[in-house]
Amino acid sequence: MDDPVDRRAFMVSALLGTAGVVAGVQSLGARTPRGETPVATVNGPQTPPAPLFGLTKFLDPLRIPPTIRSYSRQYRDELDVSLTNARRRLHSQLPETMLWTYEGQFPGPTIEVRRNRRLRVTWTNELQGTVPLVAVRAPYAVPTPANTPGYRNPDRSLPAGVELIDGVAELPPWNVVHLHGALTNGGNDGWAHNGMSPGDSQLTEYPNRQAASTLWYHDHAMAVTRFTVHAGLAGLYLIRDEEEDGLRLPSGDHEIPLIIADRNLDTDPVTGALTGQLLFKFQYQPATGTSAPVTGPFTLVNGVIWPHLDVDARWYRFRVLNAANGRFFRLDLVDEAGTVHNDAVRIVGTDAGLLPAPAAVPAGGLTVTPAERVDLLVDFSRFKGQRLRLVNTGASVDPDIMQFRVESRSRHDSFTPPARLSASYVRLGSAVTVPEDHDEVFVATTLPGVAGRPHPEMWELQEITEPAELPTRFPEEGVIQLTDPATGGVRTFRRVARLFDDTTTIFIDRGRWVVWNLIQLGGAPHPMHIHMARFQLLSRRKFADLTAFDVAVGGTSRPLSGAGDGPSIEKHEEGWKDTFNLWAGEWIRVAGRFEGATGEFMYHCHILDHEDEGMMRPFVVHPPEVARFHMRSGGPAHHSGGSAHHPGGEG
């Protein structure tokens, strides 16, 4: 199940570049490759797909966000980016949609930088009015409300149980930019509380001391990120380096970003016609208040609903980002007969850079969860004169994403995927081992309904090592027991924080290796993002039985056991990443070294609804010499190894 908000998942959850001068950035326009027009028919007449919700699929050409590069100073590069209102057509058969944008573009312009070239960006808030969307919720009894446009009856009244979300219509432009995947100090990371109002600017510096990779920037305002990103505030940020240059991967018009997301739209209640107004509509259970993350019936690529792309019969490179609030995409490349051709696709990179070698698409398709990036090579030379589709086979709505129209004539293309990609890559546990003297962090995610609370939660856990501190009986709220498969012994953990504003409990000394243990106690999956560092997936285990976790109480009645090997780690999952999906019942371990930056950072579920509903927590990275003098909850604590946690409790 790759769409976390289909009926089954909902019920489960409910129950339990080079520096240069850029002139006139404000006038930048998105380009379309190869001079396409909305009515281009590359391969002659064919039967078009039936319109869906009145929109013709594959009618409009894919737009390519403009690339902007910085202007140079002696010691750094600089860039000015404005947040502005803009009207854009998401489909040529639609009226214009009001959006919040970076530089008037949806998605925002692609920022391209060179490794080790420091960039200072001035983000200026020029937005006006309130957030340009309508937010409603509908009870699950209303047939598929999240996957159909509109929300009102023909007389403009609300159907039974459908409600406008209080306060959303009054949300002002209060924004903060986070560069997702960046290794930068806390003051430049985009702390969620540090919003800027209209007329204000956010000044950030990005050192870019990291390998060539696909990052992205987006709004991260506290408690309202689901609305601001949905309104349009997201864009790509590419880091280039000499290692990548030497591979001579497809470039220029043959390197294309694919920023995939879903949206819903309002309708005229009388005529049923789509108005172009963004509609943030989701399902909920009236009895409990438990809600499903927002999804929509329209799939957009680079801000265009169901676009097409004319391609040469040669290799292409696609920088893919899942920028959806909550929808998962399981990608397959299919022909007109529906035959899968994933053997024409190679995965060459993930979130934080290139893989050591090209990897095949896994059997069953390539799952990309919210905020994940994949760097793909596709060989179109095999499909001269054909039309292919990129589809989402994990969708609970129409699977089509976009269409590729391959030209009929052959093209000279000397490129072949290199057998070796990143010579600097090392696999943790082989060439480099996480040192024995490392820190361990334990975090668990819960189902909705714990102690009557409606939303899934994220708990920071601290191990109870003194027998006298163990509960006298189980279950007890906030206490988790599990059987460690490495030793066979039972370990007991107590929750020490669950809300963002609870006491900070995770303190990491700069330069330390940390293994994060992420444990999923049931319900919908969670793509977990940790700021500031890059990580590798060390292991994936799966508990055989989750009934030991008593949802009503919020603790285990007996130790969770049977944590056997989970699904094998695919080759592309061995790359450096910053976002890891956590499926139901899984216990994954990811390792990273917190070096090169200090400050206060965040980690969270990147389903934006979950993030805003509480699944986000802070952590601190500081110099070890300073840490010994830091007074915090429980008193000062000199680093003693073994755990990144220091004494603390729930606030």
Name the predicted role of every residue range:
Residues 70-83, 106-185, 194-230, 236-264, ...:
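Beta-strand cores of secreted/periplasmic/IMS beta-sandwich domains, seen most often
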Residues 139-159, 164-192, 196, 341-364, ...:
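Active-site pocket scaffolds in enzymes
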Residues 97-107, 299-307, 490-510:
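N-terminal edge beta-strand
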Residues 3-4, 24-74:
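C-terminal segment of N-terminal export signals and the immediately downstream linker at the start
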Residues 80, 87-93, 99, 129-133, ...:
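Short, solvent-exposed loop/turn elements at domain surfaces
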Residues 76, 83-85, 256-277, 432-477:
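Predominantly extracellular/luminal regions of secreted and cell-surface proteins
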Residues 184-192, 196-197, 264, 274-436:
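Histidine- and aromatic-rich segments of cupredoxin/plastocyanin-like copper-binding domains
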